[in-house]
């Protein structure tokens, strides 16, 4: 009679699919070529009646040696395999399963005929996995193929077997001792052959399919009479069987698709959506949408740099809300809000981080509430909010102790972040963060709104590697570089329409989006915050890198502009930066109390005088012309 064999079962740990999804997103992308993997069969402490089972986990994508190092010594056999992961479910369904199995089995036959299987007998257990990963729904369709090579052997005798099992799953027995199977070349095919096999099946009278492949290899080599010592962990079920080949084999029939638990041929489905923590699902989903950009459109996009960027949002209103949401969409994980206001009833419809409930009881603090609501959107974001007033140039000090604390806290926040967004209502509120950003070599992105216009710009940054006298060369200007007067109080004695941000609702969305996109583009440039203005589409992997973007809704036009820094700027000139570094709060306090101080420090006063003299000379020359 012929020996009986039992099919192998696959047990795939969820970590295998997590690793597969990572590889698909980051490495494989659209590549559908086969990738090597490894699995292992336990052969120790098998339960009675247990069928052979191959196990895979996240380490299955590493080398066989690394996988073996994670297992107890002498407890499992490592086998090599391959996984073919296709891009669509339709391809998974339409792929010819016969061709796939034949190709996988052909590799085993090739290893037999070129004698590679003698050097590495584990090739006889080579397996293949055909899969599709639905990364949006976290569903993984997969089907294992265990190529089984058929040959016809009949058992001529059978009996119990004693003694210890060899260390190797496949051995040649010579002089009663196991030796490497590679020595089979020295055994004539007409001689009786004695081999040993360590079985991974605990089913009585049914052996692992790998024994069938072993016997088929011997048949291909021309052996007709074989004695096999089949060792099992339960020594009482170990057997010695003598077999005789019934017909020669050259191109054996191949079978081996795994059956379902119902005994039917068909793939399995692993639904990890119900197993993974919802916060981790959200984290992976954000990364999924971003990493898909790298598959075809922007392969060299540096997402890790964007993700690691720490962003400080000064202003948590309309612009701050939209900037925060856009940063989340780009995968930024550290976002800090600063504001001194509370949520009012007019805010939620224009500021998407607030709800009606945030307006009750006098209104919740804007900064803290914005941070809390960001966490409701994405729990793993590191969002914080701080209520503080930014000291404003031209606004006299009213409470020095509190304002000094706000100054110190703002300085700490600027130092601890990479990008500073200026999103406040008033012009003078932006002065101190502009100075601090330059002092700390930070990327500063400024967004300002008009009724139907907007300005988005990145500030030029003083490069510490350049000498002071070289700082004027090619450095881009800041928000204040077009001013010939130092910032002063622009909020006092305003009517209601001047105090509120009166703008077409869509303007804020446009400006906020452009501000975040400008930041992302800057981060892709090798010079980052020191990058020059460029209108060339090849400047970064995302295209051009402008200095300023000015948009107008009345004619739906946007201009890309550039302006060098102003030598006498009240916010970014070398004299202001040096004075801030040397005097700190005392310098700021003097600027708050006396706007003329900044003009005197920077040389704007002299500019005014020269302008007046030029105007006077022009008037005199005109007057003299009247008497000619």
Curated annotation (Swiss-Prot):
One of its GO terms (biological process) is protein modification by small protein conjugation. It is found in: Cytoplasm; Preautophagosomal structure. The keyword Thylakoid does not apply. One of its GO terms (cellular component) is phagophore assembly site. A motif (GXGXXG motif) lies at residues 315-320. Keywords: Autophagy, Cytoplasm, Protein transport, Transport, Ubl conjugation pathway. It comes from the Eukaryota. Pfam families: ATG7_N, ThiF. The active site is at 500 (glycyl thioester intermediate). GO terms for molecular function: Atg12 activating enzyme activity; Atg8 activating enzyme activity. Homodimer. E1-like activating enzyme involved in the 2 ubiquitin-like systems required for cytoplasm to vacuole transport (Cvt) and autophagy. Activates ATG12 for its conjugation with ATG5 and ATG8 for its conjugation with phosphatidylethanolamine. Both systems are needed for the ATG8 association to Cvt vesicles and autophagosomes membranes. Autophagy is essential for maintenance of amino acid levels and protein synthesis under nitrogen starvation. NCBIfam families: E1_like_apg7. The GxGxxG motif is important for the function, possibly through binding with ATP. Belongs to the ATG7 family. This is Ubiquitin-like modifier-activating enzyme ATG7. It comes from Pichia angusta. The lineage of its organism: Eukaryota, Fungi, Dikarya, Ascomycota, Saccharomycotina.
